[in-house]
């Protein structure tokens, strides 16, 4: 399942004002834009490339709807001949990218765009947004998975993510980084990855005691039972109750 939203206006205003500048000056040379980073995150010695799938979906659906053009007209920044051009806009360039899950290093291009400058300018912001965020999450996940020394790591970041998209695509990126499952059900549906989970502290607190809560949950899900031990006494009775 793909993300069917039209994200064409997911860009900085200056990309569009520069596009109009190129249009008005009748200049649209073919250029090369490289997306890269200067420093590994988390003091890491490497990073993990991610975000390519969403980037491809974004490029495939890149077009200005009538609603988009009407909105841009309302800003009073754009002339009618340029807005007419946008209605017929399609991306015609070439994109080269490192496969997701690849180990990458500073100043190494993750995505290379070869296109007329008006087109390359437009896609710059969204591609950086998509690739930077998801590569960050994949890198963090990879480091956690490595530190776990072979124990399975699950992704539970949705409730702490910076909004729905960060949770949805961050979960996918964590899987690329080596996690064995995610708590995000929509990520599981959209990208066909395993969904896994435990129970909440509220489940424990809704029963007379912790042992009863554990027992009832284990009876319900004998083949998929992961118990949360840090509601009351993490290193004491909680472990004994298991």
List each language-model region with its residue ranges:
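Short acidic loop-to-helix transition motifs that present clustered carboxylates
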Residues: 210-212, 233-236
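Catalytic beta/alpha-barrel core
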Residues: 226-231
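Short beta->alpha linker loops
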Residues: 99, 232-233
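Conserved small/polar residues in nucleotide/adenosyl-binding loops
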Residues: 240-242
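Disordered, low-complexity tails and leader-like regions
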Residues: 38, 236-238
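Ordered alpha/beta subdomains of enzyme catalytic regions
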Residues: 1-223
């Amino acid at each position: 399942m793909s993300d069917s939203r039209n994200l064409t206006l997911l860009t900085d205003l200056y990309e569009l004002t520069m596009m109009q500048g190129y249009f008005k000056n009748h200049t649209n040379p073919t250029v090369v834009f490289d997306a890269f980073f200067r420093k590994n995150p988390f003091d890491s010695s490497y990073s993990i490339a991610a975000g390519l799938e969403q980037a491809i979906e974004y490029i495939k659906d890149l077009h200005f709807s009538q609603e988009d053009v009407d909105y841009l007209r309302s800003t009073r920044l754009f002339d009618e001949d340029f807005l007419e051009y946008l209605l017929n806009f399609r991306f015609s360039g070439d994109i080269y990218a490192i496969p997701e899950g690849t180990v990458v290093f500073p100043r190494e291009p993750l995505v290379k765009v070869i296109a007329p400058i008006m087109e390359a300018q437009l896609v710059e912001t969204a591609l950086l947004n998509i690739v930077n965020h998801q590569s960050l999450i994949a890198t963090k996940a990879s480091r956690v998975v490595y530190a776990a020394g072979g124990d399975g790591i699950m992704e539970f970041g949705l409730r702490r993510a910076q909004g729905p998209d960060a949770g949805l695509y961050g979960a996918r990126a964590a899987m690329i980084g080596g996690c064995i499952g995610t708590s995000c059900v929509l990520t599981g549906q959209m990208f066909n990855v395993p969904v896994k989970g435990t129970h909440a502290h509220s489940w424990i607190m809704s029963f007379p005691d912790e042992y009863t809560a554990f027992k009832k949950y284990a009876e319900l899900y004998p083949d998929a039972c992961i118990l949360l031990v840090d509601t009351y006494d993490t290193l004491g009775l909680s472990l004994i109750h298991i």
